[in-house]
Amino acid sequence: MLVSAKEMLEKAKAGHYAVGQFNINNLEWTKAILQTAQELNSPVILGVSEGAGKYMCGFKTVADMVKAMIGELKITVPVALHLDHGTYEGCYKCIKAGFSSIMFDGSHYPIAENVEKTRELVHVASQLGLSLEAEVGAIGGEEDGVVGMGECADPNECKMIADLGVTMLAAGIGNIHGKYPANWAGLSFDTLAAVSEKVGAMPLVLHGGTGIPADQIKKAISLGVSKINVNTECQLAFAAATREYIEAGKDLAGKGFDPRKLLAPGVEAIKATVKEKMELFGSVGKA
């Protein structure tokens, strides 16, 4: 059964750990993440970008697949199915499709319009028992063709959005999607501390979790980050393991070309990455 992310993130905030959001791209990705969460007794959030939703034949297909897999795999840990960086229209599509959590990314709107649209979605989500994430300050890098510069959020604007009643808030603190460049300055902990002070008990979200050093992850959690998003790292691990399998000629031996065999090393690589992150975030055994 899918659940809202509200309770798991409130527990994480109170317990000084973070829940991982791992983005899914297909059945193999979903299975690997769910099995690892169950094995480690950790709550988990499955993230779906609008691009990935389209790739997987629509949000309803995704929601139905995830619900069926939770039953088939006998998953008992809390699982939230979450729209990642949703447009206003995308949020409504996911609500209709049966997602348990949505993110409205209004960071590219003027703050007044971001507030107006977020307020409306807060009302709808709360009526349906769904969790809602909002964003202030664009996250850097590229996400489904949208390029952000890696801004630092204005703590006062963060409070304005938090006060609308969202479940969690993603504040830009110099983080970016994808690989971090060699000259990256690191997370702005001054910004994070100021935002945390303004929003109080609200769980904060760190996007672009790939490539952030472990000490910075731990410091971010100590300053109120309760949800950390990981996508690129799983993609890189999957690609490297698949490449190794093919370059070793294993696809040419026996039935090694069978997609179930060809994709297996990549799936194991995703599991290893998810396990490493859950241990780092402190969510193991917290289901």
Regions found by a protein language model. Name each.
Residues 245-258:
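Active-site gating loops and adjacent loop-to-helix segments of metal-dependent hydrolytic enzymes
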Residues 255-271:
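Short, flexible active-site recognition loops that position polar ligands and cofactors
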Residues 83-86, 268, 272:
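A short, hydrophobic secondary-structure junction motif
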Residues 19-23, 81-82, 103, 204-207, ...:
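Short catalytic-loop micro-motif centered on adjacent basic/acidic residues
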Residues 173, 208-210, 232:
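Active-site proximal loops enriched in glycine and acidic residues that flank catalytic Cys/His/Asp
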Residues 21, 199, 213, 259:
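Metal-dependent phosphohydrolase cores
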Residues 17-25, 50-54, 261, 265:
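A short N-terminal beta->alpha junction/helix N-cap motif
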Residues 3-15, 27-52, 57-76, 85-202, ...:
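Alpha/beta enzyme core
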